[in-house]
Regions:
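Active-site-proximal cap/loop segments of hydrolase catalytic domains
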Residues: 77, 148-363
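Generic structural signal for residues in well-ordered beta-strands
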Residues: 97, 143, 306-308
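N-terminal targeting or regulatory segments adjacent to alpha/beta-hydrolase or S9 domains
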Residues: 13, 19-69, 359-363
């Protein structure tokens, strides 16, 4: 359905171009623009419906082992208001966060927290992550996942609040703070952050900006160099950045801004939070050269407390260690071993068989 809508929008755009060259067609062009806008709005409405359905699915997939909740919190105001004097301008941005708590948690004890930002550019936290969240909860982790500004499934207004590498970083840290402030079973001294792709990018910037808030981090196939990324992506992708209110220009017109939003160019902020980085040579989304730049930058700055692994042509490309084949599970066990070393969950996996049983029900 989404593809059909996209095709129709393109057809209307084509008609607009043809008609604009002919006199007397202004009213028709305006009508076509309105229809195109309606199609875009429909696309967002369908995203909302899909999100509501997927939220129900969480209970089906994790309800046996986790208390599941979704709460409404705030992050900082928009970096740039379209109407600075308008009603509500300057108000904090409102967004949802997911919470997963082990059903067998003892209210008299405290448990480690994993902050788990989803990928992007525009995306959301959905049941794609089912097995990974099951694996985390089964080890005794409390998990929170922020639907930070720009996330899909919440309408056009939320979608257009995107601030890639900007205030979305604070949104994710706000989810951490909310959990500490509202749940006595969360151990504020045992908080880690883990994410893949844009989620890995957010994990990096959180430990760069808030090093005292996280004991450990994992960044899987993280977007790392936006300047390089704009060079190998197409124009449609570049527009996702230049059209953001907080960025406003393409990379060739504002290199400084894109550099500021690139982890590989900001490694001087890294304060030695234990960090594991994974990348894959056949990644079809985040080219390995971005992560190689990040790794080389960390080394050039003399940073020591990070480890990395560059996997060679692993099946799944960008998704290689989030998939369900055995080798992906073995790689995730390495990730959990890294996190567990610093967060000490009550029931850490000792083998891939433990992971298999927890995530999939059977060995």
């Amino acid at each position: 359905m989404t593809k059909i809508i996209s095709i129709l929008v393109l057809l209307f755009a084509f008609c607009q171009v043809r008609l604009s060259s002919q006199p007397g067609n202004i009213e028709l062009i305006n009508a076509i623009n309105k229809v195109g806008s309606n199609f875009e709005d429909l696309n967002h409405r369908l995203d909302v419906v899909e999100k509501k359905i997927d939220d129900i699915y969480w209970y089906n997939k994790l309800g046996d082992i986790a208390f599941i909740d979704k709460v409404f919190i705030t992050g900082p105001p928009l970096a740039k208001e379209s109407n600075p004097t308008g009603q509500g301008a300057g108000n904090p941005v409102k967004f949802w966060i997911y919470i997963f708590i082990p059903k067998d948690a003892d209210p008299a004890k405290r448990y480690p927290l994993l902050v788990f930002p989803h990928g992007g550019v525009h995306a959301n936290f959905d049941t794609y992550y089912t097995h990974i969240v099951r694996e985390m909860v089964a080890q005794g982790y409390i998990v929170t996942a922020a639907e930070y500004r720009g996330s899909t499934g919440y309408g056009a207004a939320m979608y257009n609040k995107i601030d890639y590498g900007g205030l979305e970083i604070q949104d994710v840290d706000a989810s951490r703070q909310y959990m500490i402030d509202n749940y006595s079973i969360v151990d504020r001294e045992r908080v880690g952050i883990a994410g893949w792709s844009h989620g890995g990018y957010i994990a990096l910037f959180n430990i760069f900006e808030y090093p005292d808030n996280y004991k450990v981090a994992f960044a899987g196939v993280p977007v790392s160099d936006l300047i390089a990324r704009m060079g190998y992506k197409d124009q449609e992708y570049r527009n996702l950045f230049s059209e953001q209110a907080a960025i406003g220009k393409p990379a060739d017109q504002n290199v400084t801004e894109y550099r500021k939003r690139s982890p590989a160019w900001q490694v001087d902020k890294y304060r030695n939070t234990p960090l594991l980085i994974h990348t894959n040579t056949n990644d079809e989304d985040v080219n390995v050269l971005e992560v190689e730049h990040l790794i080389k930058s960390l080394k050039a700055e003399g940073k020591k407390n990070f480890t990395y692994e560059i996997f060679q042509n692993m099946p799944g490309g960008h998704s290689f260690d989030r998939m369900d084949y055995m080798e992906a599970k073995e790689i995730r066990l390495k990730i959990y071993n890294h996190l567990n070393r610093y967060l000490n969950p009550p029931k850490p996996f000792k083998s891939v068989k433990d992971l298999q049983k927890a995530g999939y029900g059977f060995n």
